[in-house]
Regions:
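Hydrophobic membrane-insertion alpha-helices, especially the h-region
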Residues: 31-51
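Solvent-exposed loop/turn segments at secondary-structure junctions
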Residues: 67-71, 137-141, 208-209
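Short amphipathic alpha-helical coupling segments at ligand-binding clamshell hinges
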Residues: 209-220
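Short, membrane-interfacial amphipathic segments enriched in basic
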Residues: 8-21
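Extracytoplasmic "Venus flytrap"/periplasmic binding protein-like
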Residues: 109, 115-173
């Protein structure tokens, strides 16, 4: 039987069936073909998304740790104003990782807390994190492994003079007090985002791939 004859035979079979029987027949005899088509479409879609994603450039990546607003906060206005301040184009990304909550006391850390720790570790290890906005416990915890930049060394003189009264010092692994964070208590961060911390601090990660953008964020928050 030729392919044409076989196709005509299948058409006649389906023509004489009810809609329910047709659906059953097609699924029963062609399910592997259909699944293969769906799989191919899924793979092509994933590859296409990856290729398209590569046309974007991450300008800044921020992690917000221990926001106590219970989901009531939003970083949309912060992101929008940062994009404008930094002169971002349509394919420039500012990534703000929200919803990260962890109790750094090992005895009381929840599964969600461990998931947060794992995500932050992955971001740092892959050099995909520039700035942490967190409470005092987040700053203190990560500075024990010298995770943050020394702001007295990093900040340009003019910017340092502007923010020096807001510097927070945390102990590094050797017990030395290091100037690694800025208190954002007197900034408009809370008003713009609804973030609740007492107070929030900003620190720049040692391995930040976008230090200039991180400095621009500080300039934006301390006009």
């Amino acid at each position: 039987m030729s392919i044409r004859e076989e196709a005509e035979n299948e058409r006649q079979k389906l023509k004489n069936m009810s809609w329910k029987d047709r659906a059953w027949y097609v699924w029963e005899y062609y399910k592997f073909h259909l699944l293969a088509v769906i799989l191919v479409i899924g793979v092509l879609s994933t590859i296409g998304t990856m290729i398209y994603r590569q046309t974007f450039t991450t300008r800044l990546s921020v992690a917000i740790i221990n926001d106590r607003s219970a989901g009531a906060s939003s970083s949309a206005l912060l992101e929008s104003e940062l994009r404008e301040y930094m002169g971002c184009g349509k394919k420039d990304l500012i990534e703000i990782n929200e919803g990260l909550m962890v109790d750094f006391n090992e005895e009381s850390t929840s599964q969600y807390g461990y998931a947060t720790l794992a995500k932050i570790s992955a971001l740092v290890a892959s050099k995909s994190l520039d700035v942490v906005i967190g409470d005092q416990s987040a700053i203190d915890h990560y500075e024990t492994v010298s995770a943050y930049q020394n702001l007295e060394e990093l900040l340009p003189p003019e910017l340092y003079e502007r923010v020096k009264d807001h510097i927070y010092r945390a102990k590094d692994g050797e017990g030395n007090l290091m100037p690694v964070a800025l208190s954002l208590e007197d900034t408009a961060l809370g008003e713009k985002t609804g973030i609740i911390m007492d107070p929030p601090y900003l620190a720049i990660i040692q391995g930040s791939p976008h230090k200039e953008a991180a400095l621009q964020m500080i300039e934006y928050l301390f006009p």
